[in-house]
UniProtKB/Swiss-Prot annotation:
Secretion signal span: none
Record's compositionally biased regions (Low complexity): 142-162
Subcellular location: Preautophagosomal structure membrane; Endoplasmic reticulum membrane
Name this polypeptide is given: Autophagy-related protein 2
Purpose: Lipid transfer protein required for autophagosome completion and peroxisome degradation. Tethers the edge of the isolation membrane (IM) to the endoplasmic reticulum (ER) and mediates direct lipid transfer from ER to IM for IM expansion. ATG2 binds to the ER exit site (ERES), which is the membrane source for autophagosome formation, using basic residues in its N-terminal region (NR) and to the expanding edge of the IM through its C-terminal region. The latter binding is assisted by an ATG18-PtdIns3P interaction.
A GO BP annotation: protein transport
Record's keyword terms, sorted: Autophagy, Endoplasmic reticulum, Lipid transport, Membrane, Protein transport, Transport
Catalytic activities: a 1,2-diacyl-sn-glycero-3-phosphocholine(in) = a 1,2-diacyl-sn-glycero-3-phosphocholine(out); a 1,2-diacyl-sn-glycero-3-phospho-L-serine(in) = a 1,2-diacyl-sn-glycero-3-phospho-L-serine(out); a 1,2-diacyl-sn-glycero-3-phosphoethanolamine(in) = a 1,2-diacyl-sn-glycero-3-phosphoethanolamine(out)
Main location: membrane
InterPro entries linked: ATG2
Domain of life: Eukaryota
GO terms assigned for molecular function: phosphatidylinositol-3-phosphate binding; protein-membrane adaptor activity
GO cellular component: endoplasmic reticulum membrane; phagophore; phagophore assembly site membrane
Gene source species: Vanderwaltozyma polyspora (strain ATCC 22028 / DSM 70294 / BCRC 21397 / CBS 2163 / NBRC 10782 / NRRL Y-8283 / UCD 57-17) (Kluyveromyces polysporus)
Length: 1566
């Protein structure tokens, strides 16, 4: 029975007891009401707990106040606690350090509370109570030690065996006290009741924001059998952000006035809490709060067993029932990122500490499993009636009847009866019932979805869902970043939660603006044992315009694998070098099949893109950091290491797809057909920062039209190659890199109309579109581009070893570069042979084996393209372009290049206005009385008077000065003289040719700001080699059949017919076959000789050799070629709106700095067919050829077009050999009907105006044969072949032609203008070039000057002393050179006659000039593969090196040596001429000596005297003629040296004219 004390003693006793309880050590007695007795009551007002003595793990208690706390303790041991307005403010600790001396212990507080309630004996005084302090502290330390070891566990065990062993040495009184306290505590706990109202817990993570947990009411009651009942009403969790408008708070104002009071009341509080308290109570500061509701729990009822004794705080048989939970996920996503960082950091600290407890260790759990030690008496049951997640303003998720049951061995069973996904905008709900059944056993979570999951999403729902996913991803990145920053080494074997998932069929239905998308998935199965998620099939269906569902994507056999250890996949880098991709997530897909219409796909893509753009419209752009170190892990390997270096790339996820098949129906439009895309052996890697890596082993794109397949991109796989075809990389900042290898791209001109229409539509749609920041870098290696023309069947292939394309769409610039390109051509793509399976060394060899012919190469090409609102501008620079063509391949190439564009033709109704609406009176504006006598006056009667006459100079030009003519001028003649004398010409008069003909485009042509296409092509060097023979099998076969037909027809002639009557046949408009019956056997031999240069063989030739010749016949070289094209769109105008103004549709300018045509015919001794006339006055730097072509539309309302042409050509030097001329005519006149371009509406180009400058020509012509049949037919041009021209001069006069109907009429018009002019005024220059008359005319002119000059001087001054020497000097200067040249020609002619005579008598003839040696001192094959020139001669006479090292560049197997002119390699001066003359004479004498010596040697073998005489007779002509040949050659060399000494200009002329026999002249062998 309690004893009674005075009120003041009771308070003092209570104060002492409360000071022993750490929580109440700061209690003020003035706020305490005490009543001790059988029903003791304690009333506390405005209690501020001592927070310094409260130390929770990772938690710092900043403030703890209770407005009203009532404690009632009865004699029976019932403890009732009731409180109101409880506020607790805590803050997580930044560091994880804990001080064990200040740890809060619930047991310690309970012991202190119990000690104050003990019924002490009457002799008990306060001193004895003080003496008990030491023993009590020791016991408290034991309690603290035991609680610190398991303070983080769910079950709190106060009693610890280690503490019992330690306390065995304590005194007996202490043990008795301890036992008494435990009994009292156990009694109190068994009858403990508590009720708290208005409980608020504030968790401060930042100075301006905190988490507030508010509870309306908490009730704890006891039931029999140690059952506790906890009822919690209305739990609410808010995020509160404080906003203080006043920027500065005075520190002095925050401090209390009474320092002692401050020390007693606020000593344990931080400066923040003092400031917060001051803010809350200071009326001068306006405090606002931004509050977000995160979680609301309506009513919770918790029943548990435990807390029965002080020795056992275990909680078991826990039964939790929750009525309603409301979670605002959208408010959670609005929390500040820094605040979320602090929350995650605090949670990580708690998780880390809980993992460090002994019971959570791996060893303890293994010990628990091995010994079958499970806490079977603990049970947990959780029931939640309703859970609502407010995901977004449009989305909410409702869960009903959630049940969790814990069974034996810590196994849990979870049931979720119903899930409802609500669209708050349309009030549509998706209900899934029964929804989920889950099991948790041994850290394995098994999820079984019990019904089919059919989801339905509308547009607003999808937008909200995407936005939520993005925000969630942002929060997860924040969490992962925080987690990785505090990441500790992972303990091996630590158990993580494992999952197993099984679903029914899953479908997602998305409603867009005008369509639905339905995604159907087979059951999803995930097994944690294999770490694989498997889906057998996924189907994507669409019903555009709300029509019938149509399947367009099918995904087969999807397997997603998760691995704790890195998975390595083989990949390739940008250099196609092997590397490794490393990941822990691998997705394998067997097949993806896509079938859809293209226009539907565009609509679907637009709808999806609109939703994505709207969902991400308000998202701020995230700045991506450069991360490169984590992508490549390399190891430095020394030379001695045997490890093979392999680059490694890290990836978040790798997707492996065996096959991708895509088909786009009605691609672009119905005319295109279907587009089929195929990808095999694909690998896709998803990296950080949204980087993507992809490779494909094979790639193909085909066009499918009317069941016929047209390849657009095909893969060229070599059997030896394992490299991928395509590598794709998406980098940060919208950078795309594409690497392509071993593919063939096809260009079809027939697709241009479709693409042009598509491009027009895209321009209309994207006219207002903004430029995107996109960078594309494409590297193409070992790739072929096939060009297919519009109407004909040939194909041109360009093979690139390496092609680079870079595009910057922000700047609208594109760059293309390739170093080497090879050109191949075929006459019919259908004749291409089937490729063999044998590996090929190069791509060019692959196509050569399939029937293509190599026609050229192109090197170092750079293309720059720039686009803007005005149009497209492209600039192309090419270092060199080389072509090797035959007549048929040249014709094929030209037709193909023309046919690569769209053939645009129009009917006459669209081109011309053929109907006149009404009669036109042509005399309507004619003054019929203009020429009446009344209007005609005599010239003498003309008087200038009355008014001043103003002559305006700007009438013809832009001058604005006016000249006033005085009235006093009486006559026109006097006026003219006075005007000339008064106006002196101070500046030279500048005359502008063709001023009147100049067209002012500003006044006649309509220019507007419109789109244009500008193309500029610069080629430094173009080499075109023209070969004889034919590339195509069709051509060769046609010619062979024609030759055989002619042979058969002429053999069928009767015997009495004329044997010399010829039979003619023409094929391909250029090949003329003629033979007679007597010469039919030599027909094929002559053809071989003309084409291949083969000598006439002895024997029958079964087949003519029409293959391309082994060496080219003519070489065309062009240097610094510039082509500038500017095109404007053809804007169709309505006739009523047309102003009948002209419009320029396109303009082409072609400029060639220098060009030459090299003669390499075996029968020609001349070198340059066409070159620059060096000695004419032509400005330096002016191009040899310049032209301009303008295509104009005279009337805008009509489609008729006309051409304006202008040519400017430099003076030309021509060396024309008849054989070369015949070859060029035969080459360029070749026409194959297979390549004729036939338009729907044939049109002849009308040339509105043609202008050309005056061209001077210096002509050398060497005829070889005369066509007498042509003469008999009336072809007078054959008379030219009777004369050899040497330096004939003629001039093609400048001309202007108007209204020419086509190029054939242009040729006739030029002939009609130039021929009469040459005949009438230039015959002197031509006759002066006739070879037999040239020297005589020149000498005659010199003799004429010898006489005329003295006579002229005598008439002037009457003296002859000075005029005669002057005339003699002129005569010697002009005639001496001609005399010398005439002598040299006579000597060379004599040498040629002697060589022919010697050859007639069995000598070597002209072949004796060079001595063939068996050794090949120069391998021409190494210089040029196509020419294969072999042979040469390098003679030595008595150890003297020859003057010139001779190469016979045209000598072939079964071929003839090239004919070299006697005028080639002339000595440069007199000294060199005499030296060459000496060596020539010596060499020929040595030849004669060897001939006689060889005959003498053979005479010893001969037995018959007759044979000896015959042998001597054969040797005699050679011995006699060969020295004469040497003498004439020596004389010729000496005279040539003298001639070149007198005239140095002849040296350059001879180099241009004659082929050189020296090795220095490499043009003919390159």
């Amino acid at each position: 029975m309690p004893f009674w004390l005075a009120s003041n003693l009771q308070k003092k006793l209570l104060l002492y007891i409360l000071q022993k309880i750490s929580l109440f050590s700061n209690v003020d007695l003035s706020n305490v009401d005490v009543s001790l007795g059988s029903n003791s009551k304690f009333a506390f007002h405005d209690v501020r707990l001592n927070c310094d003595d409260i130390d929770l793990p990772n938690i710092e208690v900043k403030e703890s106040t209770i407005q009203q706390l009532d404690l009632q303790l009865t004699v029976s041991g019932v403890l009732n606690i009731s409180g109101e307005s409880v506020i607790i403010v805590v803050k997580p600790k930044v560091d994880n350090e804990s001080n064990s001396s200040k740890e809060f212990s619930l047991a310690k507080s309970l012991h202190d509370l119990t000690a104050s309630m003990i019924q002490f004996p009457q002799s008990f005084d306060l001193d004895e109570i003080k003496n008990m302090k030491t023993n009590q502290n020791e016991y408290d330390n034991d309690i603290i030690g035991s609680s610190s070891s398991s303070g983080n566990e769910n079950d709190i065990d106060i009693y610890n065996s280690s503490s019992d062993e330690k306390n065995e040495k304590e005194s007996e009184s202490t043990g008795t006290m301890k036992s008494m306290k435990n009994k009292i505590l156990s009694s109190v706990l068994s009858k403990f009741k508590m009720e708290l109202k208005d409980v608020i817990l504030k968790v401060i993570l930042q100075d301006s924001a905190y988490i507030e947990i508010s509870i309306d009411k908490v009730s704890l009651a006891n039931k029999p059998d140690d059952i506790r009942t906890l009822i919690i009403d209305q739990v609410r969790i808010d995020h509160v952000k404080s906003i203080v408008e006043e920027q500065e708070i005075s520190f002095n104002r925050r401090m209390p006035n009474n320092l002692e009071q401050s020390k007693s009341l606020y000593e344990s509080n931080s400066l923040y809490m003092s400031a917060l308290d001051e803010i809350q109570h200071n009326p001068e500061i306006d405090l606002k709060e931004d509050r977000l509701e995160l979680l609301v729990v309506k009513h919770s009822n918790i029943t548990l067993t435990g807390l029965s004794t002080i020795e056992n705080f275990n909680l078991k048989d826990l039964d939790i029932t929750v009525d309603h939970i409301l979670c605002s996920y959208k408010n959670l996503l609005c929390i500040d990122e820094m605040f979320f960082d602090d929350v995650m950091g605090t949670l990580n600290s708690f998780i880390s500490n809980s993992n460090n407890s002994p019971r959570s260790s791996t060893a303890y759990k293994r010990f628990q499993i091995e010994n079958d030690l499970y806490e079977n008496d603990r049970k947990l049951k959780l029931s939640i009636n309703t859970i609502i997640f407010l995901v977004d303003d449009h989305i909410s998720v409702s869960l009903s009847n959630f049940n969790l049951d814990q069974s034996e061995k810590n196994e849990f069973k979870i049931n979720l009866e119903l899930m409802k996904l609500n669209d708050l905008t349309t009030d549509r709900s998706m209900v899934f019932s029964p929804f989920l059944e889950a099991f948790i056993s041994n850290s394995v979570l098994t999820l079984n979805f019990l019904s089919d999951l059919d989801f339905y999403f509308e547009k607003d729902f999808i937008i909200g869902l995407i936005s939520v996913c993005q925000k969630t991803s942002k929060l997860m990145n924040t969490y992962n970043r925080k987690k990785n920053a505090n990441k500790r080494p992972r303990e091996p074997g630590r158990n993580n939660i494992k999952f197993s998932i099984t679903t029914k069929n899953v479908s997602f239905k998305f409603k867009l603006d005008q369509s639905y998308i339905l995604i159907r998935c087979d059951p999803i199965i995930y097994d944690w044992k294999t770490d694989k998620l498997a889906i057998s099939k996924i189907e994507f269906l669409n019903d555009l315009n709300l029509q019938k569902l149509e399947r367009f994507i099918t995904v087969d056999s999807l397997i997603l694998k998760f691995s704790n250890t890195p998975i390595q996949c083989l990949a390739y880098d940008e250099h196609f070098t092997k590397c490794a991709l490393i990941t822990k997530v691998l997705l394998n897909i067997k097949n993806i099949c896509f079938r859809y219409q293209y226009h539907k796909l565009l609509q679907l893509y637009g709808s999806i893109l609109e939703i994505i753009d709207e969902a991400t419209r308000f998202e701020k752009s995230k700045k991506l950091s450069k991360r490169g170190s984590h992508l490549r892990n390399t190891v430095r390997i020394m030379n001695s290491s045997s490890i093979i270096f392999k680059k490694k790339l890290n990836a978040n996820t790798i997707i492996s797809i065996d096959n991708i098949d895509a088909q786009f129906d009605h691609f672009l439009n119905e005319e295109f057909g279907k587009m089929v895309l195929g990808l095999k052996n694909n690998l896709i890697a998803l990296k950080e920062n949204s980087e993507v890596y992809m490779l494909s082993k094979t790639l193909s794109i085909d066009r499918l039209l009317k069941e016929r397949r047209y390849p657009i991109l095909s893969c060229l796989l070599n059997s030896n190659s394992q490299e991928p075809t395509l590598i794709f990389e998406k980098k940060v900042r919208n950078k795309l890199k594409i690497y392509i290898k071993n593919v063939c791209l096809h260009y079809y001109a027939r697709l241009l109309p479709i693409l042009t229409k598509m491009d027009t539509d895209l321009k209309k749609e994207n006219s207002d579109a903004d430029h995107n920041s996109l960078f594309i870098d494409i590297k193409i290696s070992n790739t072929a581009v096939v060009l297919h023309p519009f109407r004909i069947k040939p194909a041109l292939i360009v093979i690139f070893d390496s092609l680079s394309i870079s595009s910057d769409f922000l700047k609208c610039t594109h760059k293309i570069f390739f170093k080497h390109g090879c050109l191949l051509l075929i006459d019919d793509i259908g004749n291409m042979k089937v490729s063999s399976k044998q590996p090929w060394s190069s791509l060019s060899n692959y196509y050569l084996q399939r029937g293509f012919s190599a026609i050229g190469k192109i090197t170092n090409t750079n293309v720059n393209i720039k686009t803007d609102c005005n149009g497209v501008e492209a600039t192309t620079n090419v270092e060199s372009l080389g072509l090797s063509l035959c007549a048929d391949s040249f014709n094929t190439l030209i037709s193909l290049l023309i046919d690569l564009k769209i053939p645009i033709t129009f009917p006459d109704e669209d081109k011309y206005n053929i109907e006149v609406p009404e009669d036109v009176d042509v005399f309507a504006d004619v003054d019929m009385s203009f020429f009446d006598p009344i209007h005609i006056k005599e010239t003498e009667e003309l008087i200038i008077g009355g008014e001043s006459v103003h002559v305006v100079n700007e009438f013809l030009d832009d001058f604005h000065d006016e000249v006033e003519i005085s009235e006093k001028v009486a006559s026109p003649k006097k006026f003219f003289n006075d005007y000339i004398s008064s106006h002196r010409i101070t500046q030279p008069l500048e005359l502008e040719e063709s001023y009147i003909d100049r067209v002012d485009l500003d006044t006649t042509l309509e220019f507007t700001e419109m789109e244009f296409t500008a193309f500029n092509l610069d080629i430094k060097k173009i080499s075109i080699k023209l070969f004889d023979g034919y590339d195509w099998k069709y051509t060769r076969k046609s010619i062979s059949n024609t030759i055989d037909m002619v042979g058969r027809e002429i053999e069928d002639y009767e015997a009495d017919d004329d044997q010399n009557q010829p039979l003619h046949a023409t094929i391909f408009d250029s090949i003329y076959i003629s033979t007679t019956k007597s010469d039919v056997s030599n027909l094929k031999s002559r053809v071989n000789n003309e084409i291949q240069g083969e000598s006439n063989p002895t024997g029958f030739i079964p087949k003519v050799n029409l293959k391309p010749s082994k060496y080219f016949k003519t070489l065309i070289e062009l240097n610094n070629v510039n082509i500038n094209f500017t095109g404007y769109p053809n804007q169709e105008l309505v006739e009523s709106r047309s102003k009948d103004t002209s419009t320029i549709l396109s303009n082409i300018k072609v400029v060639v700095d220098t060009f030459e045509v090299i003669d390499n015919m075996p029968t020609s001794t001349w070198k340059k067919f066409i070159t620059l006339y060096r000695h004419d006055k032509w400005p330096t730097g002016l191009p040899m050829f310049a032209s301009e072509f303008s295509l104009v539309q005279p009337i805008n309302s009509l489609q008729a077009t006309e051409m304006i042409m202008a040519l400017n050509i430099s003076p030309l030097r021509l060396h024309i050999d008849q054989d070369t001329l015949d070859f060029l005519l035969r080459f360029f006149e070749f026409r194959d009907v297979r390549f004729e371009l036939i338009d729907d509406f044939p049109e002849v180009l009308f040339i509105q105006k043609f202008t050309m400058n005056s061209v001077k020509i210096l002509l050398d012509y060497k005829p070889k044969k005369i066509n007498y049949s042509g003469l008999r037919s009336g072809h007078s041009s054959e008379f030219v072949n009777f004369f050899i021209l040497d330096g004939a001069k003629l001039t093609l006069k400048n001309l202007k032609l108007y209204g020419i109907n086509g190029f054939e009429d242009l040729s006739d018009s030029l002939k009609n203008v130039w021929t009469p002019d040459i005949i009438s005024s230039q015959l002197g220059g031509i006759i002066g070039g006739v070879s037999p008359l040239k020297s005589a005319i020149t000498i005659g002119t010199s003799v004429k000057k010898l006489v005329s000059v003295p006579i002229t001087d005598y008439k002037q001054d009457g003296k002859l002393s000075r005029s005669i020497p002057k005339a003699v000097n002129i005569f010697l200067k002009t005639a001496s050179g001609d005399f010398v040249r005439l002598g040299a020609k006579m000597a060379s002619g004599t040498q040629a006659m002697l060589e022919n005579t010697e050859e007639f008598f069995g000598g070597t003839g002209s072949a004796g000039r060079t001595f063939a040696i068996p050794e090949k001192f120069l391998d021409i094959n190494n210089l040029v593969e196509e020419d294969q020139l072999v042979g040469g001669s390098n003679p030595k006479v008595k150890n003297h090196r020859p003057v010139a090292v001779v190469i016979d560049a045209s000598k072939m197997e079964l071929g003839q040596p090239k004919i070299v002119s006697l005028y080639a390699d002339q000595p440069l001066d007199v000294r060199e001429g005499l030296e060459e003359a000496y060596h020539s004479l010596e060499r020929h004498l040595f030849i004669a000596y060897n001939s006689i010596k060889n005959r003498s040697t053979n005479m010893d073998v001969l037995e018959s005297p007759t044979m000896t005489v015959l042998s001597m007779a054969k040797a005699a002509p050679i011995a006699i003629i060969r020295p004469l040949i040497g003498a004439t050659e020596a004389l010729s060399k000496a005279l040539q040296g003298i001639s070149n000494q007198l005239d140095k200009n002849q040296i350059e002329n001879n180099k241009d004219k004659y082929k050189s026999t020296t090795i220095i002249d490499r043009k003919l062998v390159e």
